[in-house]
Amino acid sequence: MEEQTTNVIQIYVNGTEQFNASFDFNITDVKESTDTYEFYIIGLFLSCLYTIFLFPIGFIGNILILVVNLNHRERMTIPDLYFVNLAVADLILVADSLIEVFNLNEKYYDYAVLCTFMSLFLQVNMYSSIFFLTWMSFDRYVALTSSMSSSPLRTMQHAKLSCSLIWMASILATLLPFTIVQTQHTGEVHFCFANVFEIQWLEVTIGFLIPFSIIGLCYSLIVRTLMRAQKHKGLWPRRQKALRMIVVVVLVFFICWLPENVFISIQLLQGTADPSKRTDTTLWHDYPLTGHIVNLAAFSNSCLNPIIYSFLGETFRDKLRLFIKRKASWSVVYRFCNHTLDLQIPVRSESEV
């Protein structure tokens, strides 16, 4: 009798342990499913906002910059040439972003070709954008400190050569991480990330820290030069407007790309403090919603550049008004667009600082 009682108790204990283990597992499962569902809903909402408000501006705006400037090749200035190349880089990222922002479950990362292809586009755009903005800051400093008629460095031939070298440098800087980017698997989740410690340091250093140090130095010198130029009242308004556009472009780039670089830097610092974490899952896996937000912020830069270029660039507004005048079928359309672009555009000399 005692033996039967013992067996019953043993069966009850075993069954209770199995039930508790199963219950704990189910609770954990439900919690993970709830967190995943919340991330998906919030991420989908943010992606929809980006697609409705920013993507059309970035896609149409960058195409418009290319079309308008290519239709006025004879009036293209050196800053225009740099902004055309910047628009090409931005257009690549904007087109890529439409796939990225809705890829919340990372399904296409199952395919190594797509993983590599998307990473290539992102890297080329990042490097080309920051390299062009860095060079534009240097070009602005040269324009302000040199006589436009006698500056041997600031010519259209040199500008075209500079653009070619910048694209080559962007591609070369991309090749190293491009060759080692691969899919990473964590259970049933797939991630595409160049999770190599040295490569990540390279991205943050030459793609963010060094360029912005150069930009900061250039603008410090530009501010000092402009303060000295206040005596020449005729030059000050024109130089101030040209400087305003490039400062806003760089500032927007910094605000948009800073979160992602901070996100990467945190992972790098964790790997420095504990080398065993260098092979662990990335922060994009541990904090998917934060990773999604910093990606959207980075994509937003390429969407905002056309707005800055259109409203702050008087040369572009002038060209856009002429382009609309030629293409518009109805005078009402032309008058509306002409009023929107600002009727009072001051007369400028052919060379623009």
Swiss-Prot record:
The lineage of its organism: Eukaryota, Metazoa, Chordata, Craniata, Vertebrata. Belongs to the G-protein coupled receptor 1 family. Membrane G-protein coupled estrogen receptor that binds to 17-beta-estradiol (E2) with high affinity, leading to rapid and transient activation of numerous intracellular signaling pathways. Plays a role in the embryonic development of sensory and motor neurons. Specifically induces apoptosis and reduces proliferation of brain cells. Involved in maintenance of meiotic arrest in oocytes. Disruption phenotype: Morpholino knockdown of the protein leads to growth retardation and developmental deformity. It comes from the Eukaryota. The gene is gper1. One of its GO terms (cellular component) is postsynaptic membrane. It comes from Danio rerio (Zebrafish). It is found in: Nucleus; Cytoplasm, Perinuclear region; Cytoplasm; Cytoplasm, Cytoskeleton. Residues 1-40, 103-112, 182-202, 267-292 are extracellular. Homodimer. Heterodimer. GO terms for biological process: apoptotic process; brain development; cell differentiation; cellular response to estradiol stimulus; heart contraction; negative regulation of meiotic cell cycle; negative regulation of neuron apoptotic process; negative regulation of oocyte maturation. It is a multi-pass membrane protein. The keyword Transcription regulation does not apply. This is G-protein coupled estrogen receptor 1. InterPro entries: GPCR_Rhodpsn, GPCR_Rhodpsn_7TM, GPER1-like. Its main location: nucleus. Expressed in brain regions that are known to control reproduction and sex behavior. Expressed in ovary, muscle and intestine. Expressed in early germ cells of the testis, including the spermatogonia, spermatocytes, and somatic cells such as Sertoli cells. PROSITE patterns: G_PROTEIN_RECEP_F1_1 (PS00237), G_PROTEIN_RECEP_F1_2 (PS50262). Residues 62-81, 134-160, 224-245, 314-353 are cytoplasmic. PANTHER family: G-PROTEIN COUPLED ESTROGEN RECEPTOR 1, G-PROTEIN COUPLED RECEPTOR 182 AND ESTROGEN RECEPTOR 1. One of its GO terms (molecular function) is steroid binding. It holds the Pfam family 7tm_1. Keywords: Apoptosis, Cell cycle, Cell membrane, Cell projection, Cytoplasm, Cytoplasmic vesicle, Cytoskeleton, Developmental protein, Differentiation, Disulfide bond, Endoplasmic reticulum, Endosome, G-protein coupled receptor, Golgi apparatus, Membrane, Mitochondrion, Neurogenesis, Nucleus, Postsynaptic cell membrane, Receptor, Synapse, Transducer, Transmembrane, Transmembrane helix. The chain crosses the membrane at residues 41-61, 82-102, 113-133, 161-181, 203-223, 246-266, 293-313. Disulfide bonds join C115-C192.
